[in-house]
Amino acid sequence: MSRRRVLAGAASVALLPVAVHPARATPESMAAAIREAVGGAEVRPGRVQLEAPSLAENGNSVQITVSVESPMTGADHVKTIHVFSEKNPITTVARFHLGPRAGRAKVSTSIRLATTQRIVAIAAMSDGSCWSGAADVVVTLPACVESGF
């Protein structure tokens, strides 16, 4: 294979269309993800407390705790807790499935945040209602950075 042919091939590869992925989600894409997760049900504020640091020095590990006011009985319990981020490359951060045997509706985890943003937690209840809570987190050292985009 000649050098000329290799260079021509490399140039043609550079001209191929590249799939473009958004570097981060948007508030609109987060709203769409929430609608999809709750099946179009109305999401009301309240009953959900999202604890997160107001300032996170490192976006690679941000500790959050979500608790929901619920008696956690067979008739009235949290079925699912969804966590969404406004500006991460992927909007849905976490999903927890609970039942009455969980005892209490409280989950904790560490998440990665790409930048300063709002985090929203949605609790889907056994009666079909959905409740929300939110927290704003300022990130000084971002995570979730995808090179090449």
Task: For every predicted segment, state its role.
Residues M1-P17:
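N-terminal secretory signal peptides and thylakoid transit peptides that target proteins
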Residues R24-N60, F96-H97:
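Transition segment at domain starts
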Residues Q63-P71:
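Short edge beta-strand/loop segments characteristic of extracellular beta-sandwich folds
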Residues P89-R112:
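An anionic, turn-rich surface loop/hairpin at beta-sheet edges
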Residues A114-R118:
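Extracellular Ig-like/FN3 beta-sandwich strand-entry sites
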Residues D136-T140:
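Short beta-strand edge segments in extracellular beta-sheet folds
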